[in-house]
Amino acid sequence: GKGINLYTSIYTTAIRGTIRHNSIYSNTGLGIDLGNNGVTLNDTGDVDTGPNSLQNFPSITSATSSTRVVTGRLSSRANTKYTVEIYSSPTCDPSHFGEGKVYLGAVSVTTNGSGVGSFSVAVLSSFAVGSKITATAIDPAGNTSEFSACRAAN
């Protein structure tokens, strides 16, 4: 099954579900699923509603093992400060979106007026070449995104 599933019922919508520093891996579904419907694709401006406000996930653009540097970007609400947490796993889910076996570190990302923020961070923990690197984004209210798509470390 899924690692963590946040969803809307007839009684309530799960919000402010902060998921931090966890080890979520080796399950048969997504590591984090907002809405109980598989990967929730990112949307421009991230103004939708639903479990954890359907917080957009970051995208990893590179992960370099020798320097422990991970780069990426987040497209979400404009002029907002987020925490991006970075993880590694030996494999990805069948969806090619991540899980998070090993917590590597976090970085603050502030989006611009268009809702885009970039990051480049030397994480605290090392990771091997070929490791699958993923990330989550946490908004100021504590809403955590699903894991990003996997990026193989070089």
Please name every model-derived segment.
Residues 2-13, 30-37:
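Glycine-rich beta-solenoid repeat tracts in large extracellular/virion proteins
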Residues 33, 83-87, 134-136:
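Beta-strand signatures of extracellular beta-sandwich domains
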Residues 42-77:
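Surface beta-strand/loop "capping" patches
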Residues 71-73, 114-126:
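Exposed aromatic-hydrophobic patches
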Residues 79-81, 128-132:
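Extracellular Ig-like/FN3 beta-sandwich strand-entry sites
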Residues 99-114:
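Solvent-exposed serine/threonine-rich low-complexity stretches and specific carbohydrate-binding patches
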Residues 141-154:
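Edge beta-strands of extracellular beta-sandwich domains
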